[in-house]
């Protein structure tokens, strides 16, 4: 069982049962990845910019959530929300250029090209102290 609680009051906010359906979850995530990979780069950039805008619009609510759930000081929580929004915005603005294929000048070779393709879902154990930053980066 996963429990979230407010460290300032000791009250339990939410409880989540553990799941035995790891294969089902990974299947769903893989479907999402397949859809995302097929999405045009310009559309992906637009989505990232929309996420940045949503973080800006809901900054107080997002900051309050991590203040309540993990005891992060309000100023630090606001700073993390702003940082995450800036990361989404940066990738929305610069990401398409980063994904452009590169041609390398290699002596004796006809063509050397570097392409950037998504490889698949990532499962990770993340530190708890920067939840929005961990996802944005």
Residue locations for each model-derived region?
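N-terminal Rossmann NAD(P)-binding subdomain characteristic of aldehyde/semialdehyde dehydrogenases
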Residues: 49-136
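Conserved active-site and cofactor/substrate-binding residues in soluble primary-metabolism enzymes
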Residues: 20, 24, 117, 137
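Short, structured beta/alpha segment
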Residues: 1-68, 90, 97
């Amino acid at each position: 069982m996963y429990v979230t609680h407010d460290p300032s009051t000791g009250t339990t906010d939410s409880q989540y049962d553990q799941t035995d359906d790891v294969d089902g979850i990974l299947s769903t995530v893989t479907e999402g990845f397949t859809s995302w990979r097929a999405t045009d780069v310009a559309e992906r950039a637009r989505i990232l910019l929309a996420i940045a805008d949503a973080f800006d619009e809901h900054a107080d609510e997002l900051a309050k959530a991590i203040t309540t759930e993990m005891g992060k000081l309000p100023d630090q929580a606001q700073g993390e929300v702003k940082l995450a929004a800036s990361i989404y915005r940066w990738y929305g603005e610069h990401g398409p250029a980063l994904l452009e294929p590169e041609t390398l000048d290699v002596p004796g070779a006809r063509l050397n090209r570097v392409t950037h393709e998504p490889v698949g879902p990532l499962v990770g154990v993340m530190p708890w102290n920067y939840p929005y930053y961990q996802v944005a980066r």
